[in-house]
């Protein structure tokens, strides 16, 4: 077999390059410096790119900034929840809500104090008008035996009666809400409540604690 000459192959390649790129191409196939790089369709590959580490760092920074922004949107208390899990935040907020709920025992004691203050004011006015008269009602207090036998209930606790809707599920909560609104409207229209609101509240609380 006769081997082909290398000179003929080189001449063919140089002739083909000269046809594609023009006369500025050298015989060895290297382009001249005046060749425009932007005309190359793959020129964007040579542009600087963002590395994987930089992408990961940017994502972490944006995530942390979003968390801080959400924490400061609410109250000033929420700003102290940075770096705390969502479950612990929910527990703390639930505890704060429980502390804000009205307590029946505190309301009863405040009503008793208000009643005692009214009695003291009335007694003092009577004593100023009648110094010689003795008011026996101010010194003698009748105590009901049922009131003495009442068990002490922790403040903030609510007695769950039988045959009542369960507040833990959605259906029971709706039923309880409807009952409470109906009872609230009934209380507002009650004549005893309109005449003496504190006395009516005191009696209702005593009945509920029995």
From Swiss-Prot:
The keyword Endoplasmic reticulum does not apply. Its main location: nucleus. Residues 1-27 are annotated as: Disordered. It is found in: Nucleus, Nucleolus. Residues 10-21 have a biased composition (Polar residues). The keyword Iron does not apply. GO terms for biological process: maturation of SSU-rRNA; maturation of SSU-rRNA from tricistronic rRNA transcript (SSU-rRNA, 5.8S rRNA, LSU-rRNA); ribosomal small subunit export from nucleus. GO terms for cellular component: 90S preribosome; nucleolus; nucleus; preribosome, small subunit precursor; small-subunit processome. Keywords: Nucleus, Ribosome biogenesis, rRNA processing. Induction: Transiently up-regulated during the initial 15 minutes of dough-fermentation. Involved in ribosome biogenesis. Required for normal pre-rRNA processing in internal transcribed spacer 1 (ITS1). May be involved in the movements of the replication forks. Belongs to the SLX9 family. Interacts with the 35S, 23S and 20S pre-rRNAs and with the U3 snoRNA. This is Ribosome biogenesis protein SLX9. The gene is SLX9.
């Amino acid at each position: 077999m006769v081997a082909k000459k290398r000179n003929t192959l080189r001449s063919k390649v140089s002739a083909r390059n000269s046809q594609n790129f023009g006369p500025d191409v050298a015989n060895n196939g290297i382009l001249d410096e005046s060749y425009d790089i932007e005309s190359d369709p793959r020129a964007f590959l040579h542009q600087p790119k963002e590395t994987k580490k930089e992408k990961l760092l940017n994502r972490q920074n944006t995530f942390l900034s979003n968390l801080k922004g959400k924490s400061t949107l609410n109250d000033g208390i929420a700003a102290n929840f940075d770096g705390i899990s969502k479950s612990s935040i929910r527990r703390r907020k639930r505890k704060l809500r429980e502390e804000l709920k009205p307590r029946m025992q505190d309301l009863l004691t405040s009503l008793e104090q208000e009643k005692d203050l009214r009695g003291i004011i009335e007694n003092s006015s009577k004593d100023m008008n009648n110094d010689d008269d003795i008011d026996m009602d101010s010194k003698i207090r009748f105590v009901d035996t049922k009131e003495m036998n009442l068990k002490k209930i922790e403040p903030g606790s609510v007695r769950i009666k039988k045959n009542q809707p369960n507040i833990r599920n959605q259906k029971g909560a709706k039923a309880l809400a409807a009952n409470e609104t109906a009872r609230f409207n009934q209380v507002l229209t009650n004549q005893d409540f309109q005449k003496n609101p504190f006395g009516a509240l005191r009696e209702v609380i005593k009945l509920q604690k029995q």
